[in-house]
Amino acid sequence: MNLVNEAVIENLRENTKRLLDVYEDFGLNKTPKNISEDISGLLETAIERNVEGAIAPKVDSEPDIRYNGTAVEIKTSAGTNWRGGTFSKRPGYYIFVTYELDENN
């Protein structure tokens, strides 16, 4: 299962930069948790648009991605600690994403 290909990574990189620019342009201060949720949503969309057979339901009660019927969850963190909500312990596959923001973001 290869859901994170070069097209997905490039799409995520570009859209994350655009979103962070919007935050800055409008003077929005986001917490790491907010940014993690937004990056997760951008990754869901990037996978859905670039991987055949991938669907991003965008509903909390569903997995982040369904890939040919298989549940895939996305976890994002600005650090090394992984937290999750009500549905974070679903069986299935997981994609773990860590990120670091710097002055270029």
Residue ranges and their predicted role:
Residues M1-G41:
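Interdomain/boundary linker segments immediately adjacent to catalytic/signaling cores
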Residues N5-N11, I47, V97-N105:
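Short, Φ-rich (hydrophobic/aromatic) sequence segments
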Residues G27-N29, D60, N105:
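N-terminal, helix-rich and Lys/Arg-enriched segments in bacterial and organellar proteins
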Residues L42-N50:
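Amphipathic alpha-helical segments that form well-ordered structural scaffolds
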Residues N50-P63:
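Short, well-structured beta-strand/strand-turn elements
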Residues S61, N68, R90:
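Residues that flank catalytic or metal-binding motifs in active/ligand-binding sites
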Residues I65-T76:
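Conserved catalytic cores of phosphodiester-cleaving nucleases, focusing on short active-site segments
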Residues T76-N105:
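Catalytic cores of nucleic-acid endonucleases
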